[in-house]
Amino acid sequence: MSRNFYNYDPTVDILQPPLIPDVILKSNLKELTLPTGNQVLESLPLTAWFHRTRSNIISHLTRYEAEWETQKSAARNELHSVKSYLKGNIFNDARELYALPETNILTICAYFAGRIITNRKNWGVSAATLQSVKSSVHRPSLMARVCTSIPSKMVLPWAMAGAVFKELAPTAFDNTITSLESDILDPGFVAQYKTLWRDYYTNGAKKASIEAAELLEGKLQGYIGFARNFIIYSTR
């Protein structure tokens, strides 16, 4: 008996076109024959969509990469400008620049010390909530109330940090104030606060304290001189 019992010839089936209408085949599909004899159908709209999507992705990636490189270059230039400005206008003292790490560490420690001082829990203020109603309620002292007030919380940590930085790096501190006044703050605001500083501090509180110290020193010297003369005349 023949192997092709139903008169089936596989070569004829391979060479026959697929069972697809000619309209669809001519408009949306493309038929390709591989070297092995297999037939492949390519969807032209799907291929066009893949090409279009691939081109858009490549275009977006190229644009984002160029923008990223531009931003990196701009950030690098800004960082270089900031370093040059700080080195030329703020930290222009070689001794202070050499000791800058220690100065920064101590300044940060002073800031956190101010935060600790202005924390209510460190003064025992919150202990009253843990006590019963019948027991005596813990009342904070005047110093605790002053240190834990809202103005103290806002000013004291920065004031302590500024005092330490001014003590360890006076030139850099003065240069920082000068740079803030000339490059960042408004000239009208600078002139106004300088006038207030001169009227109320330089010619006011500071002058009064200097005069009081000189008066007290003169009085003490007079009393010491009187006591010394009294002792001298008494021992004769």
From Swiss-Prot:
Bilayer topology annotation: Multi-pass membrane protein
UniProt signal peptide: none
Alphabetical keyword list: Membrane, Mitochondrion, Mitochondrion inner membrane, Transmembrane, Transmembrane helix
A biological-process GO annotation: positive regulation of protein oligomerization
Mitochondrial intermembrane side: 1-96, 166-236
Membrane-traversing stretches: 97-113, 146-165
Stretches of the chain found on the membrane's Mitochondrial matrix side: 114-145
Origin superkingdom: Eukaryota
Subcellular location field: Mitochondrion inner membrane
Entry GO terms, CC: MICOS complex; mitochondrial crista junction
Quaternary state and interactors: Component of the mitochondrial contact site and cristae organizing system (MICOS) complex.
Family per similarity comment: Belongs to the apolipoprotein O/MICOS complex subunit Mic27 family.
Function, as annotated: Component of the MICOS complex, a large protein complex of the mitochondrial inner membrane that plays crucial roles in the maintenance of crista junctions, inner membrane architecture, and formation of contact sites to the outer membrane.
Annotated protein name in UniProt: MICOS complex subunit MIC27
Organism this protein belongs to: Eremothecium gossypii (strain ATCC 10895 / CBS 109.51 / FGSC 9923 / NRRL Y-1056) (Yeast)
